[in-house]
Swiss-Prot record:
Pore-forming protein that forms cations-selective hydrophilic pores of around 1 nm and causes cardiac stimulation and cytolysis. Pore formation is a multi-step process that involves specific recognition of membrane sphingomyelin (but neither cholesterol nor phosphatidylcholine) using aromatic rich region and adjacent phosphocholine (POC) binding site, firm binding to the membrane (mainly driven by hydrophobic interactions) accompanied by the transfer of the N-terminal region to the lipid-water interface and finally pore formation after oligomerization of monomers. Residues 100-115 are annotated as: Trp-rich region, which is important for the binding to lipid membrane. Keywords: Cytolysis, Ion transport, Membrane, Nematocyst, Secreted, Target cell membrane, Target membrane, Toxin, Transmembrane, Transport. It comes from Oulactis orientalis (Japan anemone). This is DELTA-actitoxin-Oor1b. One of its GO terms (molecular function) is channel activity.
Amino acid sequence: GAIIAGAALGFNVHQTVLKALGQVSRKIAIGVDNESGGTWTALNAYFRSGTTDVILPEFVPNQKALLYSGQKDTGPVATGAVGVLAYYMSDGNTLGVMFSVPFDYNLYSNWWDVKVYRGRRRADQAMYEGLLYGIPYGGDNGWHARKLGYGLKGRGFMKSSAQSILEIHVTKA
């Protein structure tokens, strides 16, 4: 993982991350821009399917963006890159970010969501399911936005391809 200036987050940065992952059939470059006014501290990443070779950036200051990536497990296995990230925010709440790049596009599509949870909460299967079965956004090559509560709003975009990009901006409402 890495931290960059929030204003620098864009599709060229994501493409660089995807290229670094090599010839993996299911992979995702994730960028989350912190414009919340506070600092975020990494709690953990939970993978329902797949893995990563990078470390979740520990701190994300205001006006900076975190870069992260996920990929299917190596070898001839039927897995995608599916999971959730959790960051503890300086306001005492937790930001959860769910991503899903499935193995089988005959049955599934790309999905993503972002939510603020009250208090401190680590990413786990329950957080993943809550975000997936709540009101997630499809990875449909379009921008989506909603209020997150706690004075914040989220706006994001996800590609529909198996080599996907997820870009999220968390700002003051």
